[in-house]
């Protein structure tokens, strides 16, 4: 009811999908994921033909093809050899099942450098591109991808406190709220602001003069001493999220999402 294709990596999942598709009166397409080295999801290559053959016999599913995922858990870089392995496995599954398995999904944004180099095998006919489109990054090194923008998403927080305070805590210190041991450099008195945001991982201030110092569960502490644009209580501060920051903000019910349509 919600999707035409599902990426799967186990027979048990396929069986449950087949039962659900039967109850819904539809024939659902699945893409069998194969692990070619990144060690995230996927059946091991030497079991791919066997698993696809089993799934192909389920009554309410169509095995649309094979897929893989790279540069995710293990950071393994896509290569021509790994893509050729996937295409070869597709051909073997075709022979074993008699099904066309037309879709061969070679990976995600990490495959773009291989594609741009002209080394992508012709049998790869699908990529699942996300970060490179939305954030404009080459995910292998996070450098800007040619022809894209890196400011398409901004996380905006409001300043709820602005005080000049010491740069080193006063008193004995232990772990912070998240179990980390913090280290501080004495920079004298600094103008510090608190934003109504949570942990600072994976965000970068748009203003290069603003520095993220740390956070509690719902307070982001920033140094605005050298901010290019003066701030005050009630001011908005803008941040550029990376993939992790965008994921957290997108899934949080406490973050309002606004599409501005700006050029």
What are these regions (language model features)?
Residues 1-81, 88, 92, 96:
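Active-site-proximal beta-alpha core segment in soluble small-molecule metabolic enzymes
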Residues 83-263:
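Active-site anion/phosphate-binding pocket segments in diverse small-molecule metabolic enzymes
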